[in-house]
């Protein structure tokens, strides 16, 4: 027997979600490990590039899109979560890793679109404006087809520039920590040395606690 077809999202819900995105001014996409399980990295990248929406990932979702991509802003994460007016959540649960999607981690006023293959996860820890049950690869494919002509990158340009400016303001302190010769070694210097040594497509396994936080930068 062949593989089971990937479940798609309700077309009306996809259309409703696109309407919210078209009216938003400060949207973000938050993705997680479900992107890998669904083999949806290409669809995710196509979506954020077509729409021009900034992307943030959970620790388990890192690497789906290169983190030096022009729509990824590693050090403006907290500001983006607090200032966003629309959260597009795909491939991740609203669990403790992202503060259950609630304030103060996220803006309490932000609208939310949640895509999950498990219907029980929709709105489990925070109310959502549009919930879409389906496979991440399939649903993102639906968005990519339906978004043509409906989402304009220029609408979010000011928001993207704002997040990029926050990143730029934090860069000097980050670079200073990465180049210091202090003993014991600064965690960011350690991360830089490892990064420079590894190939770009290397797989890195990071444990928890502080090294996870520094490695995120």
Model region roles, listed by residue range:
Residues 1, 27, 54, 172-175, ...:
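Proline-rich low-complexity regions
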Residues 4-11, 43-50, 98-109, 148-160, ...:
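Phosphate-binding glycine-rich loops and adjacent basic patches that engage nucleotide phosphates
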Residues 164-217:
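Active-site diphosphate/adenylate-binding microenvironment
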Residues 2-5, 32, 127, 178-182:
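Conserved short-loop catalytic and cofactor-binding motifs
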Residues 1-25, 142-152, 157-172:
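Cofactor-/ligand-binding subdomain signature composed of acidic, glycine-rich
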Residues 57-162:
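Glycine-rich, acidic loop regions that bind phosphate or pyrophosphate groups
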Residues 7-10, 16-87, 196-217:
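Anionic-ligand anchoring segments at beta-strand to alpha-helix junctions in alpha/beta enzyme folds, i.e.
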Residues 7-10, 14, 33, 37-44, ...:
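Generic structural signal for well-ordered, non-membrane alpha-helical segments
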